């Protein structure tokens, strides 16, 4: 296994549906930026942004999550609390929260499929980070796998790439310690 450091989240977000274009335009205006990167969507903060956008639509004005957000408005760890709550409600059958989670998951799958092609991850793609361990069951879902492999002529190649999730949230620290130990041995 070779670990490749990446700032792949800074790749430009590529909306694929009318709904995703609407989200992209809302984010562009809301964040006052010219370019929306995948990190703005495919992250814990991104899941919160998708929820904020979706809850701003008229059909969601009276959703119970509106009250929950107002109660937490000044919480220090809002970017951690909201994604967990969105996923919990989605798993409990909340249709709107499920829609929000699916938009996020589709974008995540599409981005990882692009990265798998770009880096030729033929031996497998390992996902780590803050959101990955919390959503690992979703990386086996039909929605994720469809978005991951929907890559035109390279669809069959991407379908053959195994996707794994590193569940240890301290994986990066462990890896850094191993690298430091290796460098010390050389000195």
Where does each model-flagged region fall?
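A short, charged helix-loop
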Residues: 4-31
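ATP-binding/phosphotransfer module of carbohydrate and carboxylate kinases, centering on a glycine-rich
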Residues: 22-187
